[in-house]
Amino acid sequence: MKKIFLLMSVVILAAACKSAPVATGPEDNSGFKTTEANNQNAKGLNLPDGASVRETPRGKVLVLHDPKSKADVGKPGSTYEVKFGFDNTIEIGTYKDAYNLVYQIINNNSGIRIISEGHSSKEGPAPYNYKLSQRRSDKSYNYIIKLGVENSRLLKNAFGEALPEYPTLKENRRSEFIIIMTEDDLKKYNDFAKTVDINKETN
C-alpha cells in the first residue's frame, strides 16, 4: 500500500511539473500595483521611437526596432534582440541596445512591470532546454536590474523550447520581454503559462 501511495505521489508531481511556472519576482513584488487608470491598453504606453507591441495569446511582447537597420520592419535584422549562442547563456548581437531600451521603457512607464522571458531552440531534450531557458531569463533579468531598475518592476519566467515562434533555431534561442500593464495582464499571462507543457519535445 505504501509503495502504491509513493508511486501515485510521483505521478502527481510529474504531472504538476509539466506546465511552465507562473511569472515570478522578488518577494516585495506583492507590494507593486499597476496603475490601471493610466494604462488601459497598449496605446497608453510611452514607448521610444521604433518600439511597438506584438499581441500574443500570453500578452504584449515588446518589439524593439533598430532605427539604423535597412531591413523592413518585422524582417530579420530589423530589431534589437537578445539572442544566445548554442547551448549557453552568452548574449550575441544587439542585446545591449535591447536591454537599454527595456530599461528606458520601464522608467518611462511608472505603472508597468516587465517579464524577462527565456526561450531555447528544440535541439536537445525538452527538460534540459527548459533549464537552459531559465538561465537565459535569469541572465536578462540580472542585466536589467544592474542598469538600475527596481526589482519590484521586473518578473521572470521561461518556456524552454515550447514556444518556437521564429522560423530558425538561432532565432528561437532568445529572451523576450512581456509588458504587464494591469493585474488582468498578469493573470492572462500566468493562465497561459499553466497550459504550456515544457517537457514536450518540439517537432
What are the language-model segments listed below?
Residues 1-4:
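Positively charged n-region of N-terminal signal peptides that target proteins for export
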Residues 20-112, 181-203:
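Periplasmic peptidoglycan-binding/tethering modules of Gram-negative envelope proteins
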Residues 15-16:
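C-terminal motif of bacterial Sec signal peptides marking the signal peptidase cleavage site
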Residues 111-115, 153-155:
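Residues at or immediately flanking beta-strands
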Residues 120-193:
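Periplasmic OmpA-like peptidoglycan-binding domain that tethers envelope proteins to the cell wall
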Residues 6-9:
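Sec-dependent N-terminal signal peptides
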